[in-house]
């Protein structure tokens, strides 16, 4: 099951007390955390769970983000998949199928976790209802999309000491995608070539949306 690339575009936090800043304050705090990040790279471990908590799929890889609008998300195991945004187009590459899907970086694609993290934080209050929860060194933000044209029903971002450590998203069926980040580097130098994609010779190209 190759659900990862379509999921893009991702327990204890639910028990944390809800802060008084549930809407505008939570959005402003999250925007401030995201605006302080110009680039972000990390290893990741992803698990997809069904509504009962049964693990359906696990994957691992590396990701790079550069704001605004650029990212490179690469699954290394159990099989390689690559998703790259150059700020104008999004490329989804499946080496096993020798297939590349190319689509514009439009509103629909922006409503995904990767583009949310790499895009403009100012759009948060317009597009999402935001609630915040706080622990000792941990902050968790729950985002509920205001538009139905999204890939998730809710998205949780978890920060520890003001650094993004993980995210969890849930779709309309109750299926959850949980992503934990490790070996994190914030605002480091990332080679610009990470955010370019050259279509491999002989690959089948599917262009969507112009």
UniProtKB/Swiss-Prot annotation:
<keyword id="KW-0653">Protein transport</keyword>
<protein>
    <recommendedName>
        <fullName>Outer-membrane lipoprotein carrier protein</fullName>
    </recommendedName>
</protein>
<keyword id="KW-0143">Chaperone</keyword>
<dbReference type="Pfam" id="PF03548">
    <property type="entry name" value="LolA"/>
</dbReference>
<dbReference type="GO" id="GO:0044874">
    <property type="term" value="P:lipoprotein localization to outer membrane"/>
</dbReference>
<comment type="function">
    <text>Participates in the translocation of lipoproteins from the inner membrane to the outer membrane. Only forms a complex with a lipoprotein if the residue after the N-terminal Cys is not an aspartate (The Asp acts as a targeting signal to indicate that the lipoprotein should stay in the inner membrane).</text>
</comment>
<dbReference type="GO" id="GO:0042953">
    <property type="term" value="P:lipoprotein transport"/>
</dbReference>
<dbReference type="InterPro" id="IPR004564">
    <property type="entry name" value="OM_lipoprot_carrier_LolA-like"/>
</dbReference>
<keyword id="KW-0732">Signal</keyword>
<keyword id="KW-0813">Transport</keyword>
<dbReference type="GO" id="GO:0030288">
    <property type="term" value="C:outer membrane-bounded periplasmic space"/>
</dbReference>
<keyword id="KW-0574">Periplasm</keyword>
<feature type="signal peptide">
    <location>
        <begin position="1"/>
        <end position="22"/>
    </location>
</feature>
<dbReference type="InterPro" id="IPR018323">
    <property type="entry name" value="OM_lipoprot_carrier_LolA_Pbac"/>
</dbReference>
<dbReference type="InterPro" id="IPR029046">
    <property type="entry name" value="LolA/LolB/LppX"/>
</dbReference>
<comment type="similarity">
    <text>Belongs to the LolA family.</text>
</comment>
<comment type="subunit">
    <text>Monomer.</text>
</comment>
């Amino acid at each position: 099951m190759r659900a990862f690339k379509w999921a893009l575009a991702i327990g204890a936090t639910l028990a944390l007390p809800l802060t008084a800043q549930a809407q505008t304050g939570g959005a402003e705090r999250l925007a401030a955390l995201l605006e302080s990040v110009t680039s972000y790279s990390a290893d990741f471990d992803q698990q997809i769970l069904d509504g009962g908590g049964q693990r359906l799929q696990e994957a691992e890889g590396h990701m790079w983000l550069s704001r605004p609008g650029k990212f490179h998300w690469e699954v290394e195991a159990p099989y390689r998949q690559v998703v790259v945004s150059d700020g104008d187009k999004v490329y989804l590459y499946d080496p096993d199928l020798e297939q590349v899907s190319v689509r514009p970086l439009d509103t629909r694609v922006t409503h995904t976790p990767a583009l949310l993290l790499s895009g403009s934080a100012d759009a948060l209050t317009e597009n999402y209802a935001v609630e915040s929860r706080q622990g000792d060194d941990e902050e968790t933000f729950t985002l509920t999309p205001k538009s139905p044209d999204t890939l998730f029903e809710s998205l949780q971002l978890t920060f520890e000491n003001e650094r993004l450590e993980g995210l969890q998203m849930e779709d309309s069926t109750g299926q959850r995608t949980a992503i934990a980040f490790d070996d994190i580097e914030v605002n480091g130098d990332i080679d610009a070539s990470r955010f370019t994609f050259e279509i491999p010779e002989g690959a089948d190209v599917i262009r969507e949306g112009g």
